[in-house]
Amino acid sequence: MEIIPAIDLLNGKCVRLNQGNYNEVTKFNSDPVKQAEIWESKGAKRLHLVDLDGAKTGEPINDLTIKEIKKSITIPIQLGGGIRSIDRAKELFDIGIDRIILGTIAIEKPELVKDLSKEYPKRIAVGIDAKEGMVATRGWLKQSEISSLDLAKQLNDLDLAAIISTDIATDGTLKGPNVQALREIAEISINPVIASGGIGSIADLISLADFADEGIEGIIVGRALYDGSIDLKEAILTLKNLLLQDAFNEKDKFLV
């Protein structure tokens, strides 16, 4: 199970939104390239990058910053926000992005997601961003008429890298993840699930580690890293030791 630090880009700055609200922006670093280097130096094995301008407008406003981040670090990047065409997906793969995250088009253009997953197996993730169980699109500004569970079920036919499940009500709040919603998604999905939203403490990470064998393979952490609630290096070590202990205990069961 990976702990994946997040960088959200808005006007070229590293920010966090509260529950996806573009009117509640906290700027954490005016140099997102430097921030990416910091996360790699603290042991991150993957970076979660979101183009908030792209998610809202569909325009690649932050491409220069994205390219600079890619050049500055060696770990793989998964990128989402405003990717709504095959041409845009190919542009991002061409500059070295490891995975792209599709959200809005999974609802509006499902055939495009299907085509991309065939052309780029295990390199497409789908973001299921839900509010009260229903999927939101267009940078969380529009509510769809499909439930998160129904969408996860529809995606079972595709060879995805992961489903990134975000509970909008908890995102940016530090109040803990919606564990029940995550377990329901993981139970219904054949694809691996990455948890996102609400992580506020190492205790929250530990609570999700219990479900590593149920299909939750990663946890995205944002605000808690920036405000010091979680130290990335400590969190990675804690989770690693916990999972090793669980594996050791499981092995002991077979030896008894």
From Swiss-Prot:
UniProt keyword terms in alphabetical order:
Amino-acid biosynthesis, Cytoplasm, Histidine biosynthesis, Isomerase
This protein's GO cellular component annotations are: cytoplasm
Q: Where in the cell is it found?
A: Cytoplasm
* Reaction catalysis annotation: 1-(5-phospho-beta-D-ribosyl)-5-[(5-phospho-beta-D-ribosylamino)methylideneamino]imidazole-4-carboxamide = 5-[(5-phospho-1-deoxy-D-ribulos-1-ylimino)methylamino]-1-(5-phospho-beta-D-ribosyl)imidazole-4-carboxamide
Annotated catalytic residues: 8, 129
Where mainly located?
Answer: cytoplasm
Top-level taxon:
Bacteria
What family classification does the UniProt entry report for this protein?
Answer: Belongs to the HisA/HisF family.
Cited HAMAP family:
HisA (MF_01014)
Question: Under what name is this protein listed?
Answer: 1-(5-phosphoribosyl)-5-[(5-phosphoribosylamino)methylideneamino] imidazole-4-carboxamide isomerase
* Native species: Prochlorococcus marinus (strain NATL2A)
